[in-house]
């Protein structure tokens, strides 16, 4: 039962977190939050659910239906803030009910921001959550919730969320941010609509289909001048633009209001075909009222890439301005209702079949409201108390007399004819109507051409000529046409000159491409079809043949298959060590076993070293903890501690560590007398126990205020420890990283290597030996080294705890293995240390390889490339510069858009992509596929293939970015929402095409 209650409380709190995130994002992206925003209503609903959870009946009131009112009223007796909210809500309710409040109440409302002494009208949703909403608008909701959490015993049961010692304060803290925002009442142009989500933008783009892209820049531009509206490409672009505008108009935006929308409305476009379901919508703009109907096939994007089929369904779509409609025929049947629109020329539009459920009446009601105040329906709809709008009760006329249908018991009329009339413009077009009724339809065209005829030549000889293009030799109007001819000749010269200089700029552009982008790709193009079969990838059969006969299979051919088709999942465990450099292609099994043995011995040695150092670190924490509490309880060193925090390095994590400068030993010799006592299992460094210890005590780090004389580099600290202790060093073998040396800090021989397959903790005897060894070797560690190790252990523990916990593989035992591997790598690279994100790179390797030693070796090889992306390296700046060059050359239109909208051509939104090789952008299965292609591309096409994947991600959504005119904030929000929803195979295909395009540009073929 307890677990079920906890699950309910976690769900309630999670809903509040989600709504708080939404409202904070709106405040950042739109620079304001309107009081009528839907996010405010959603947040109030989530908070109200938390406040009502397990509320005592006495606090809620036995007979009151409004429990929130009872709660605030009861709390207001002892909480002044809640009492003020009660007064303000009472005033708002009086305004909503139409009763005029007192003068003092009007003054209070005027202070809230109402203008002219009139309070703004509240929507029904705002009235529903008026108590929580008012507290939020007054910026005191967090204080009210905090008061309820502190006095929960008066108002809540023991199982309530606010009675929980953890969840209650968390809820109050979550509301601090929304209570700090400024809410506006200003009616802005985009007040009635909110920015669509990434999913909705993608859905809109899918409806209208991908328009044609611009020509490839690899082709030399033609010097011919393309005539407007004469080529097929121009018409296709125009149709694509029309389709885009049509789809955007279906949604509510700043220009139009959506009055009505209903799906599955049937229309029969032709007599010989079945009715087609579609989406019917009614839109109101400043000038007109428009009805639109779109087939469901277009709305759902289920037509694929068949342009012919799409064009057919686009022909079925309806766009009907109501300024052209004079009457509406309505027919009611048991299966629903049918509506027929009749135009001014008497033509009937295709019938619209509404489903059952009163949808026809609902549409007419929205139409009548949209026609006001300039137009109206004749006869108007009736209003019936308790039901709202109803059809008018009319009498049917017979040839003999008027018969009341209802009196005869037959029932109400089922067929209606409504006229659309505009009382103020009734006789505006009478003249035109008379002409058309008399049969002079062509006179309308003549009326349109009249202004052109009036501007004709005044020369009688020209006007009397039989041909409009023939000019008599004796014509006197030739001087009038001479400036026009000179203008045409001048335009011709300008066009030719512009074409020439464009061609010259293009040639110079190609020269720039070859100069700056030649290093990004291999010049030798390796196609997928020579020999064929590379698109199928590296299969299990091909790999088994390679293992049987390594000599007849070339490494480049295997990598080509991986690059174009990936690796079959069953053999990834065997192939990845080759791709990462742990094994070399062509190695025999004996040579591979030798490499594995050397790596296992190396890993166990490093594991023993840092675990021995960890014992000293934990012992140092336990000794410093009591004295630290005493020091802070006295309050004597708080000011000095704050001063030391000012000198923290800003590049390190913002975690606050308690300073123990005054308690540190004066030198390593003081540590020799202190033997660490075994108070925990050797797994004390595991995430769970380490996290528990971190809550009780933290210690000083190199970036938490140490004196400047001790803030020298980590490498110098390690070297001093080596000199003092005369410790034993070791060199990297061939399987480890080239040129890297691990810090040898122990002065004695370390325990032997553990069993490579063992996942449990070491035996107690080995642990005791390691503890004694750590006590003996404590003098080998300088304070700087211990601080550095402790800081990195803290960061690793914090990151391991939250690393992909939703993925099935990462159980507690596997997280412990992940920590051991990461600590071993960081121990060998203390100059770099641990940086957030390294666990994300190690986790997929451990999932596939499922071997600690192998994952450690492969991760070390991977970090040779990825380590440069972290702050200690400089690869990130070069990535941004190369991305700028690539997109400027391959997609100049999108580059200009980025430059105009706040100049986000620095591509900082790609930082996480490059840092983690797109690990957080893709699902785990897609991460495997993308990573192996990146590794194979280093030999096949480009050592910088990550650039082309990043560019492919941008190109995949370029039309959405361009059509919505996204700025830097919008594009970050868009890609964050699209994380783990990308089509990885499509992204890889685009990336490979981009590489080939750059290769062709350089080769100029």
Curated annotation (Swiss-Prot):
<dbReference type="Pfam" id="PF12068">
    <property type="entry name" value="PH_RBD"/>
</dbReference>
<feature type="domain" description="RUN">
    <location>
        <begin position="34"/>
        <end position="191"/>
    </location>
</feature>
<comment type="similarity">
    <text>Belongs to the RUTBC family.</text>
</comment>
<feature type="region of interest" description="Disordered">
    <location>
        <begin position="657"/>
        <end position="687"/>
    </location>
</feature>
<keyword id="KW-0963">Cytoplasm</keyword>
<comment type="subunit">
    <text>Interacts with RAB4A, RAB11A, RAP1A, RAP1B, RAP2A and RAP2B. No interaction with RAB27A. Interacts with RAB9A.</text>
</comment>
<dbReference type="GO" id="GO:0042470">
    <property type="term" value="C:melanosome"/>
</dbReference>
<dbReference type="InterPro" id="IPR037745">
    <property type="entry name" value="SGSM1/2"/>
</dbReference>
<dbReference type="GO" id="GO:0031267">
    <property type="term" value="F:small GTPase binding"/>
</dbReference>
<dbReference type="GO" id="GO:0005096">
    <property type="term" value="F:GTPase activator activity"/>
</dbReference>
<feature type="compositionally biased region" description="Basic and acidic residues">
    <location>
        <begin position="672"/>
        <end position="681"/>
    </location>
</feature>
<comment type="function">
    <text>Possesses GTPase activator activity towards RAB32, RAB33B and RAB38. Regulates the trafficking of melanogenic enzymes TYR, TYRP1 and DCT/TYRP2 to melanosomes in melanocytes by inactivating RAB32 and RAB38. Inhibits RAB32 and RAB38 activation both directly by promoting their GTPase activity and indirectly by disrupting the RAB9A-HPS4 interaction which is required for RAB32/38 activation.</text>
</comment>
<dbReference type="GO" id="GO:0034499">
    <property type="term" value="P:late endosome to Golgi transport"/>
</dbReference>
<feature type="modified residue" description="Phosphoserine">
    <location>
        <position position="402"/>
    </location>
</feature>
<keyword id="KW-0597">Phosphoprotein</keyword>
<keyword id="KW-0343">GTPase activation</keyword>
<dbReference type="InterPro" id="IPR021935">
    <property type="entry name" value="SGSM1/2_RBD"/>
</dbReference>
<dbReference type="InterPro" id="IPR004012">
    <property type="entry name" value="Run_dom"/>
</dbReference>
<dbReference type="Pfam" id="PF02759">
    <property type="entry name" value="RUN"/>
</dbReference>
<feature type="region of interest" description="Disordered">
    <location>
        <begin position="205"/>
        <end position="236"/>
    </location>
</feature>
<feature type="region of interest" description="Disordered">
    <location>
        <begin position="729"/>
        <end position="761"/>
    </location>
</feature>
<dbReference type="Pfam" id="PF00566">
    <property type="entry name" value="RabGAP-TBC"/>
</dbReference>
<feature type="region of interest" description="Disordered">
    <location>
        <begin position="95"/>
        <end position="121"/>
    </location>
</feature>
<feature type="domain" description="Rab-GAP TBC">
    <location>
        <begin position="566"/>
        <end position="938"/>
    </location>
</feature>
<dbReference type="InterPro" id="IPR000195">
    <property type="entry name" value="Rab-GAP-TBC_dom"/>
</dbReference>
<protein>
    <recommendedName>
        <fullName>Small G protein signaling modulator 2</fullName>
    </recommendedName>
</protein>
<feature type="compositionally biased region" description="Acidic residues">
    <location>
        <begin position="730"/>
        <end position="740"/>
    </location>
</feature>
<dbReference type="InterPro" id="IPR047345">
    <property type="entry name" value="RUN_SGSM2"/>
</dbReference>
<dbReference type="InterPro" id="IPR035969">
    <property type="entry name" value="Rab-GAP_TBC_sf"/>
</dbReference>
<dbReference type="InterPro" id="IPR037213">
    <property type="entry name" value="Run_dom_sf"/>
</dbReference>
């Amino acid at each position: 039962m307890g677990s079920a209650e906890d699950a309910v409380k976690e769900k309630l709190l999670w809903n509040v977190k989600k709504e708080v995130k939404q409202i904070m994002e709106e405040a950042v992206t739109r620079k304001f939050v309107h009081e009528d925003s839907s996010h405010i209503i959603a947040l109030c609903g989530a908070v109200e659910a938390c406040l009502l959870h397990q509320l005592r009946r006495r606090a809620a009131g036995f007979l009151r239906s409004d429990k929130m009112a009872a709660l605030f009223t009861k709390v207001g007796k002892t909480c002044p803030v809640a009492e003020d909210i009660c007064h303000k809500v009472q005033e708002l309710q009086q305004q909503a009910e139409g009763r005029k409040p007192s003068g003092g109440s009007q003054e209070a409302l005027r202070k809230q921001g109402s203008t002219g002494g009139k309070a703004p009208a509240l929507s029904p949703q705002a009235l529903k959550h008026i108590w929580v909403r008012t507290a939020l608008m007054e910026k005191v909701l967090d204080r009210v919730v905090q008061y309820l959490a502190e006095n929960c015993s008066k108002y809540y049961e023991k199982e309530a969320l606010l009675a929980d010692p953890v969840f209650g304060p968390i809820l109050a803290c979550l509301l601090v941010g929304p209570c700090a925002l400024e809410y506006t009442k200003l009616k802005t142009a985009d007040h009635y609509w909110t920015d669509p989500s990434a999913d909705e933008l993608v859905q809109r783009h899918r409806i209208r289909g991908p328009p044609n892209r611009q020509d490839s820049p690899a082709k030399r531009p033609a010097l011919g001048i393309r005539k407007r509206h004469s080529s097929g490409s121009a018409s296709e672009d125009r149709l694509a633009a029309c389709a885009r505008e049509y789809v955007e108009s279906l949604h509510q935006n700043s220009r139009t209001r959506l009055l009505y929308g209903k799906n599955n409305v049937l229309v029969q476009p032709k007599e010989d075909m079945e009715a087609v379901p579609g989406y019917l919508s009614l839109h109101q703009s400043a000038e007109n009222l428009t009805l639109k109907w779109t087939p469901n096939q277009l709305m759902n994007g289920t037509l694929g890439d068949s342009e012919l089929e799409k064009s057919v369904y686009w022909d079925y779509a309806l766009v009907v301005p109501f300024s052209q409609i004079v009457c509406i025929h309505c027919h009611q049947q048991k299966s629903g209702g049918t509506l027929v629109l009749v135009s001014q020329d008497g033509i009937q539009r295709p019938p619209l079949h509404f489903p059952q459920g009163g949808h026809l009446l609902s549409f007419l009601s929205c139409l009548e409201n949209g026609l006001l105040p300039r137009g109206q329906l004749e006869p108007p709809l009736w209003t019936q108390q308790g039901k709202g709008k109803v059809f008018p009760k009319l009498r049917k006329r017979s040839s003999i007399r008027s018969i009341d249908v209802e009196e005869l018991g037959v029932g109400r009329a089922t067929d209606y004819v409504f006229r659309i009339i505009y009382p103020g413009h009734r006789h505006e077009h009478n003249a035109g109507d008379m002409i058309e009724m008399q049969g002079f339809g062509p006179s309308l065209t003549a009326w349109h051409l009249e202004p052109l005829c009036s501007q004709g030549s005044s020369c009688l000889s020209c006007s009397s000529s039989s041909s409009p293009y023939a000019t008599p030799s004796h014509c006197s109007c030739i001087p009038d046409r001479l400036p026009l001819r000179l203008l045409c000749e001048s335009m011709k010269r300008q066009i030719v000159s512009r074409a020439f200089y464009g061609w010259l700029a293009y040639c110079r552009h190609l020269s720039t491409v070859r100069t700056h982008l030649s290093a990004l790709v291999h010049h030798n193009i390796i196609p997928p079809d020579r020999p064929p079969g590379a698109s199928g990838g590296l299969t299990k059969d091909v790999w088994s043949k390679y293992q049987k006969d390594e000599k007849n299979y070339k490494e480049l051919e295997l990598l080509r298959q991986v690059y174009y088709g990936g690796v079959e999942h069953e053999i990834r465990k065997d192939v990845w060590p080759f791709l990462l450099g742990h094994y070399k292609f062509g190695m025999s099994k004996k040579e591979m076993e030798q490499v594995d043995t050397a790596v296992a011995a190396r890993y166990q040695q490093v594991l023993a070293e840092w675990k021995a150092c960890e014992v000293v670190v934990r012992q140092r924490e336990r000794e410093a903890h009591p004295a630290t509490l005493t020091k802070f309880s006295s309050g004597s060193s708080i000011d000095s501690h704050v001063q030391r925090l000012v000198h923290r390095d800003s590049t390190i994590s913002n975690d606050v560590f308690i300073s123990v400068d005054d308690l540190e030993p004066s030198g390593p010799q003081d540590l020799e007398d202190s033997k660490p006592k075994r108070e925990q299992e050797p797994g004390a460094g595991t995430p769970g126990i380490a996290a528990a210890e971190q809550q009780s005590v933290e210690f000083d780090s190199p970036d938490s205020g140490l004196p400047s004389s001790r803030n020298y580099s980590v490498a110098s600290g390690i070297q001093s420890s080596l000199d003092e202790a005369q410790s034993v060093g070791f060199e990297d073998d061939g399987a480890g990283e080239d040129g890297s040396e691990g810090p040898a800090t122990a002065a004695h021989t370390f325990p032997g290597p553990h069993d490579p397959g063992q996942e449990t903790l070491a035996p107690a005897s080995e642990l005791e030996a390691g503890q004694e060894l750590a006590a003996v070797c404590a003098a080998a560690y300088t304070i700087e080294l211990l601080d550095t190790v402790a800081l990195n252990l803290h960061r690793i523990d914090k990151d391991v705890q939250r690393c992909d916990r939703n993925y099935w593989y990462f159980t507690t035992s596997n997280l412990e293995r992940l920590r051991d591997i990461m600590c071993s790598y960081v121990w060998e690279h203390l100059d770099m240390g641990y940086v957030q994100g390294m666990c994300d790179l190690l986790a997929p390797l451990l999932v596939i390889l499922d071997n600690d030693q192998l994952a450690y070796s492969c991760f070390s090889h991977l970090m040779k490339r990825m380590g440069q992306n972290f702050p200690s390296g400089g690869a990130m700046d070069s990535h941004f510069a190369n991305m700028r060059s690539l997109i400027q050359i391959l997609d100049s239109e999108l580059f200009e858009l980025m430059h105009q909208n706040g100049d986000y051509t620095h591509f900082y939104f790609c930082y996480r992509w490059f840092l983690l090789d797109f690990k957080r952008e893709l699902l785990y299965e897609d991460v495997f596929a993308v990573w192996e292609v990146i590794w194979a591309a280093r030999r096949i096409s480009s050592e910088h293939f990550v650039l082309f994947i990043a560019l492919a991600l941008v190109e995949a959504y370029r039309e959405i970015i361009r059509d919505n005119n996204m700025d830097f904030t919008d594009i970050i929000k868009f890609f964050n929402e699209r994380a783990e929803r990308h089509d990885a195979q499509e992204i890889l295909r685009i990336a490979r095409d981009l590489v080939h395009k750059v290769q062709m540009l350089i080769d100029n073929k």
